[in-house]
C-alpha cells in the first residue's frame, strides 16, 4: 500500500522562546496506524509541530505547508531541526516515496535525524518531493544507502549546516527563490 503524501494546513502561532517542533512517542499501535509503521517493534517517534495533537498530523507527511510561515519562521525552524543531529530514534513512519519514485529495498525505517533533514526540505523547497522523494540518503553512486546514522548521515548534516549559514547570509527568501541545494558538492544525495 502506498501512502499518499498530502499537505494539510495548520494555523500555528509561535510564541517567542518556544520550540516550533516536538517529538511524540508512540508505544502502542492502534488499528489506524498499522499500515504506517515500519515494523512491529515500538516505540516509534515523530517530529511534529508543537501545536499539532491531531491523529491526522501523525498520518500525513509533511503535516504542514511552508506557505503559512514567514521567512523568519522558516529560518528558525531550520535552526531547530538541525539540533536533531545524532537523534537515531526510529521514526513513526515507514519509508515511503512520493511521486514516481519507488523503493523496494530492505530498509523500512529511518531515524529522527533523517526525518529532520526531510522536514527541512519540505519547508524550504516549493516542490520538495522532486528534490527528496523519500527519506533515504545515498552516495553519488547510488549503491550505498543510509536512513539511520553513519558517515553519509553525518556528511549530510555537515552539508546542511554549511548550507544554512549560506542561506541565512543570502536571506531565506532569496535562497528559496534560487532553490539552493543543501547537499551540493557533499558526495551525498537523496534517493530518487
What is the predicted function of each stretch?
Residues 16-192:
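Extended repeat-based scaffolds of very large eukaryotic assembly and lipid-transport proteins
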Residues 1-25:
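Bacterial Sec-dependent N-terminal signal peptides
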Amino acid at each position: 500500500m502506498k501512502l499518499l503524501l498530502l499537505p494539510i494546513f495548520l494555523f500555528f502561532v509561535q510564541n517567542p522562546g518556544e520550540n516550533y517542533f516536538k517529538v511524540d512517542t508512540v508505544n502502542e499501535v492502534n488499528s489506524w496506524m498499522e499500515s504506517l509503521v515500519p515494523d512491529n517493534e515500538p516505540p516509534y517517534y515523530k517530529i511534529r509541530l508543537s501545536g499539532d495533537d491531531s491523529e491526522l498530523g501523525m498520518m500525513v507527511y509533511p503535516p504542514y505547508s511552508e506557505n503559512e510561515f514567514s521567512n523568519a519562521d522558516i529560518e528558525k525552524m531550520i535552526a531547530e531541526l538541525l539540533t536533531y543531529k545524532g537523534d537515531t530514534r526510529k521514526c513513526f513512519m515507514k519509508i515511503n516515496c512520493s511521486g514516481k519514485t519507488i523503493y523496494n529495498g530492505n530498509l523500512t525505517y529511518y531515524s529522527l535525524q533523517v526525518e529532520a533533514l526531510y522536514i527541512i526540505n519540505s519547508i524550504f523547497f516549493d516542490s520538495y518531493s522532486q528534490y527528496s522523494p523519500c527519506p533515504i540518503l545515498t552516495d553519488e553512486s547510488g549503491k550505498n544507502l543510509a536512513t539511520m546514522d553513519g558517515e553519509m548521515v553525518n556528511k549530510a548534516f555537515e552539508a546542511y549546516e554549511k548550507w544554512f549559514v549560506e542561506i541565512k547570509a543570502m536571506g531565506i527568501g532569496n535562497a528559496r527563490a534560487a532553490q539552493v541545494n543543501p547537499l551540493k558538492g557533499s558526495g551525498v544525495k537523496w534517493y530518487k
